[in-house]
Amino acid sequence: MKIEAFTKTYDQRTVLDFPGIELQPGKIYAVIGANGSGKSTFARVLSGVLPADRRQKPLRVASVGYMPQKTYAFRMSTRANLLLNGTDRARAGELMDALQLRPLENKRADRLSGGETARMALVRLMMRRYALVILDEPTAAMDMESTSISETLITHYVQQTQCALILVTHSLQQARRIADEVLYFHKGKLLEAGPKQAVLDHPTRAETRQFLEFCGV
């Protein structure tokens, strides 16, 4: 799966200049970088929420699943929200059990806490199969237990569906735990990409090294 080069400009200022990359099925790509480095803009353009400049088409994939930073819930039960994205009730039950949502299945989803809403949104996405999945800070609102369970589910989902998965994360520990590859963004550019051990332990760019040192890696 190829992501073509593209740019994104706001008010005549280029906030993202992406050179393109080839994604492999069955792999998790962690996107890291400081705030304002272009990570979420990258995710939003790939998902189709934001258009790239000059009608560029960075991605030609039939099925893309996207979980934004700010998840949403319709004013219906948690279970009904999940079944909007698939009618497999057994699958919904399995995922609710895995992410400890069963006690909340009849609760109105728009009254869930931030962490509960994030878990519901992740389950809702996993009700379907996609060629590409994009998760933007999916566990930021979760506690440690829910984060651990979610990471296991994400890994299993990728293994089962053989999708390519882009994980935008502020947690280098999370990138180290579940990613296969790491993409480092700096000031709107992809500066370094490769296997996680190479990027996190032996970065080639000075900017990457400085970022990792600042994060205590």
Where would I find each of the regions flagged by the language model?
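Conserved ABC ATPase "signature" region
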Residues: 89-104
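C-terminal boundary and immediately downstream tail of ABC-type ATPase nucleotide-binding domains
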Residues: 197-217
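Conserved catalytic motifs of ABC-family nucleotide-binding domains
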Residues: 71-84
